[in-house]
Design a protein with these regions (language model features):
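A structural signal for multi-pass alpha-helical bundles of membrane permease subunits
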Residues: 3-271
């Protein structure tokens, strides 16, 4: 574990150092000072990709958590086929990202896609710049629900049944019991899922890379900050500038995580 942690820190330091350098495709570098950061802060593409990433996270995080929590509450009850339902909802997590992208590209196809066939429309789900980012976020929600649900199920099974029996005696059941008992006792799990999903959503890459073509007119409205890093570092060979973009993302994640850690004191109950 310590070896793995040291490798992570080493790579972080190396990335930060590279952000101050002009790095070539073959690893040769020369110190460039704050040139990469000056360029980055003046680059509208960086801010557009950061905005795209925030928009994606605003949809993916709350919806994936809310839907997963509702499913977990229902699947935590005694019901026929409970194990099968759990497996079905968790399935997207174990499916290869390439297969997920292929299925959703077919669903979203404006000419012969299933969604347009059902709706009887010709909506350009992933090529219309106004709605493409929403379409990509929907895939993200669908893909992560199963993972969130499993975590919530684990948390629900740790809640003693005595609380619910006492609530029944007092006449508090159903929705009232959920908000008075389930949610407060599950708040540490909800907080963990929230923090990890915010970090995960801000690092979205594979969905954009596999669903959106380079020639797609909506690409600039959907490309994430990590996708932009990939473009500069690996496609354009500008690893110094790519490292500066990653440092920006790291700073954003750290700030948001600190705010979440401060805010959790008001609503997370550990006792």
């Amino acid at each position: 574990v310590s070896s793995a942690a040291s490798d992570v820190y080493k790579r972080q330091v190396q990335t930060i150092y590279q952000s101050f350098c002009k790095v070539g495709s073959f690893g040769d570098s020369s110190f460039a000072g704050f040139a990469n950061y000056k360029k980055m802060f003046a680059d509208p593409e960086v801010w557009q990709s950061l905005l795209n990433t925030f928009k994606y996270a605003i949809i993916e995080v709350p919806f994936s958590i809310a839907i997963a929590l509702i499913l977990a509450v229902f699947l935590n009850r005694k019901m026929h086929g409970r194990t099968i339902y759990r497996a079905i909802f968790f399935l997207p997590m174990v499916v290869a990202p390439a297969a997920v992208a292929m299925v959703w590209r077919w669903l979203y196809n404006s000419q012969f896609g299933l969604l347009n066939h059902i709706l009887g429309t010709k909506i350009e789900w992933i090529s219309n710049p106004k709605i493409a980012w929403i379409s990509v976020a929907i895939i993200g929600v669908w893909s992560i629900i199963g993972y969130n649900m499993v975590l919530f199920l684990a948390g629900l099974q740790e809640i003693p049944k005595d609380y619910y029996e006492a609530a029944d005696i007092d006449g508090a059941s159903g929705v009232r019991a959920f908000f008075k008992i389930t949610l407060p006792l599950l708040s540490p799990t909800v907080f963990f899922v929230l923090v990890t999903r915010v970090i995960g959503a801000l690092q979205v890459f594979d969905l954009v890379y596999m669903v959106m073509d380079i020639s797609n007119p909506a690409l600039k409205k959907t490309e994430s900050i990590v996708y932009l890093f990939y473009q500069y570092s690996f496609q354009n060979g500008n690893k110094g500038y790519g490292s500066a973009i990653v440092v920006l993302l790291l700073a954003v994640i750290m700030v948001l995580t600190v705010f979440q850690m401060i805010g959790q004191k008001k609503w997370v109950h550990y006792n």
